């Protein structure tokens, strides 16, 4: 009883269509869809950038570890 029924939603939708017209609603929907798509693209490129930075940091750490191991093995060979 306290909730909004389907009939009430249909009446509201009909009033909105009558007030704004279908062309205006279509353009608003397209603009909203474009904004959502742009936001998703921005978020995915940000995540890709972070992933690249993480992988670069891991590679740097691995190369540092490898260099340290080589230095230790040379020290052992000299001793």
From Swiss-Prot:
Topological category with respect to the lipid bilayer: Single-pass membrane protein
GO cellular-component term (any): TAT protein transport complex
InterPro entries the UniProt entry points to: TatA/B/E, TatA/E
GO terms under biological process: protein transport by the Tat complex
Membrane-crossing residue ranges in chain numbering: 1-21
Domain of life: Bacteria
Disordered: annotated span: 47-79
Compartment list: Cell inner membrane
UniProt xrefs under Gene3D superfamilies: 1.20.5.3310
Gene Ontology terms for molecular function: protein transmembrane transporter activity
Alphabetized Pfam families for the sequence: TatA_B_E
Keywords for the protein's UniProt record, in alphabetical order: Cell inner membrane, Cell membrane, Membrane, Protein transport, Translocation, Transmembrane, Transmembrane helix, Transport
Subunit and partners: The Tat system comprises two distinct complexes: a TatABC complex, containing multiple copies of TatA, TatB and TatC subunits, and a separate TatA complex, containing only TatA subunits. Substrates initially bind to the TatABC complex, which probably triggers association of the separate TatA complex to form the active translocon.
Function: Part of the twin-arginine translocation (Tat) system that transports large folded proteins containing a characteristic twin-arginine motif in their signal peptide across membranes. TatA could form the protein-conducting channel of the Tat system.
Family, as annotated: Belongs to the TatA/E family.
The protein's name: Sec-independent protein translocase protein TatA
Gene name for this UniProt entry: tatA
